[in-house]
Amino acid sequence: LWWLFRDNLLPSVTKFVGYARTKLTVAELKEKCHPYMKVDAAHEEKYDEFWALNFYVAGSYDGRRDFELLNQEIGKFEVGKTANRLFYLRLPPSVFETVTVHIRNTCMGLKGWNRIIVEKPFGRDADSSNKLSEHLAKLFTEDQLYRIDHYLG
């Protein structure tokens, strides 16, 4: 995401809202990520701009209320006529179904498109992968789903 932002390949209104179980501030997240970001001196100001657009919500994977809070946080930034939402999921198979149900039931935007990016491989084997695909098909339309390889993510 940093490289896309750095190279001006994202819409100027883009915001990033992270969600995970770990209680972190954006400053702590920035500190943890910095060694991997490869920021040269010419882009340090742009790097700070990037982090100013980042927000973070800590919550459980199985708590509907936590996903309602995530939805509220995302909603704070939807001020225009159109607001698209893209959810990037990199989850352990054990919580995948629960999280996707909560996203579907509490976090889908009403003012634009919603996209779900699923990082493959998901599941433990072919059977569990097929089961997760069937689960996703019950929640989202195919044009909402994007499956990408782990190494591309």
From Swiss-Prot:
GO biological process terms on file: glucose 6-phosphate metabolic process; glucose metabolic process; NADP metabolic process; pentose-phosphate shunt, oxidative branch
Gene Ontology terms for molecular function: glucose-6-phosphate dehydrogenase activity; NADP binding
Known catalytic reactions: D-glucose 6-phosphate + NADP(+) = 6-phospho-D-glucono-1,5-lactone + NADPH + H(+)
Primary residence: cytoplasm
Entry keyword set: Carbohydrate metabolism, Cytoplasm, Glucose metabolism, NADP, Oxidoreductase
Protein's UniProt name: Glucose-6-phosphate 1-dehydrogenase
GO CC annotations on file: cytosol
Entry's family note: Belongs to the glucose-6-phosphate dehydrogenase family.
Presence of the UniProt keyword Isomerase in the record: no
Amino acids binding NADP(+): 21, 120
Gene3D superfamilies per record: NAD(P)-binding Rossmann-like Domain (3.40.50.720)
Compartments where located: Cytoplasm, Cytosol
Role played: Cytosolic glucose-6-phosphate dehydrogenase that catalyzes the first and rate-limiting step of the oxidative branch within the pentose phosphate pathway/shunt, an alternative route to glycolysis for the dissimilation of carbohydrates and a major source of reducing power and metabolic intermediates for fatty acid and nucleic acid biosynthetic processes.
Organism this protein belongs to: Culex pipiens
Ranges annotated as spanning the membrane: none
Keyword Protein biosynthesis: no
InterPro entries found in the cross-reference section: G6P_DH, G6P_DH_NAD-bd, NAD(P)-bd_dom_sf
Enzymatic class: oxidoreductase
